[in-house]
Amino acid sequence: MLTRRRFLGYSALSPALLASRPLLRSGFAMPPASSSQAPLRIAIIGSVYHLGSNLQSIADRFLVGYPYAGNWHMPNVQVVSLYVDSLAPKFAGPIAWGRRLEAARHPQGKRNSGQGPATQPIELGPPHPPIAQSVRRRPGALGLGIQLPEKFGPMTDLSGVRSREFGFRLCRNIPEALRAGGERLAVDAVIVVAEQGDYPTNSKGQALLPSYDFFQQCVQVFEEERRGVPYFNYKQLSFSFPEAQQMVNTAERLHFPLLAGSSFPVASRLPDVDIPRGTHVEEAVMVGAGGFDGSDFDALEAMQSMLERRKGGETGVKAVQLLEGDDVWQAGREGRYSRELLSSALSRSDTPMGLTLLDGRNQDLVASGVLPQLVKNPAAYCIEYADSTRATLLMLNGAIMDFNISARVAGKELVSTQFFIPPTPNETNTACLADKIEQTFMTRKTPYPVERTLLTSGMLEACLESRHRLNQRVETPQLGVKYQPPAESQYTRT
């Protein structure tokens, strides 16, 4: 359906293309494989490029390389263009997408808001990004000079700094980024990180991130060129499951690889274990920390990356319920989730709080009964799978600060591990993800199915719908997503 925000989002594209009928699937050509010698040309599209932002964490891996398997790895790629949505109001031409204009309709306001209101009108600027700034030379650790803005801090935009250092083009809209300033598709792959930034939220508390809008604009260029390129979308496909489903269907129809998701499923694990493929899983409990519509997606997808390996593969989710407050503890007393699995998952944590912080003693947070004292606002994401497998994600802010899981596998002992997520700025988990992105770009094959991220996107949306309905159980017939996991585990082992 063509809505006002969709029309505004596509206004940067050619009128002739918008008026044309969809191209036939059979006429969509596969591009020739890139030479192993020539670097792949990459366009990067994102929301904000600040120090510590998700975009910086991913994009910098393809500019300076990353540690992997005991070595420093430099991808055989060349970043040729960058579009940053937070800079769009400073640039000439129409805004690249229209969802920001709907902020007034959502009384919940904005997540990670900036200086101005989301409905701030776009002012036309000069024909090219104003990236020239007053800079000073600051010595690096090895005496190397690095150009940094005069006023450098956590919220300083890095687009201009990186553009000058690495020589790529800053673009005013997404089609320009894919064409690298020319008239034809000029990149071999696309990286999209539509996270954080100044976006409105809806009544469920979901940030209206523009992942789908960015994707649609890229697809318009692909269709005009009658060829697509590998595409990576960081974290959830969309806040809307129908939009996420359409993204997957479009990639399949147009024959280009679509990889998506969080770094958690591919991060190292402590210990190095996985659920044996094809075994029966009775129940799983995941524990973590964070907020709604944030790190809960990371945790849900990490949990899904293990549970999809159960007998029969993934068959979908039939219902969800998000519990809060005392209802979380009551659910444990009633057996809605296993306290044994909860204790097992917590035993993998390296960040226990409570008495451990006060006097160094270890304690069983479950048996001692201190969890309700430590966790003031608990949340439980209860997932009922179509094959009767049960899973619960417990967000326990105040008790732990890492992410751990325990699962009961039929005929075996409990399988438990920690998803190892180092603190910033190292975040080697994103290096693990960068390796999977690079693998997809080089081979034009995804190492794991995008349906994992599709299902997780739908689970999160349904859980937030449950919360919106005062924590009622919500049936999810739309989440009958079926797929088979990869034959080999894809998390990092070296």
List PLM regions with ranges.
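Beta-strand-loop-alpha-helix segment that lines the small-molecule cofactor/substrate pocket
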Residues: 195-265
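Contiguous beta-strand/loop segments that form the cofactor/metal-binding neighborhood of enzyme cores
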Residues: 288, 298-424, 431-451, 460-463, ...
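A structured beta-alpha segment of the ubiquitous adenosine-cofactor-binding alpha/beta core
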Residues: 161-189, 193-199, 214
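N-terminal Rossmann-like dinucleotide-binding module
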Residues: 29-107, 123-163, 284
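NAD(P)-dependent dehydrogenases' Rossmann-like dinucleotide-binding region
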Residues: 42, 257-269, 277-292, 314-326, ...
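Redox-cofactor binding/interface segments in oxidoreductases and associated redox assembly factors
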Residues: 44, 188-192, 233
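Loop/turn elements at helix/coil->beta-strand transitions in domains of secreted/extracellular proteins
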Residues: 39-41, 77-79, 185-189, 226-229, ...
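N-terminal secretory signal peptides and thylakoid transit peptides that target proteins
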Residues: 1-15
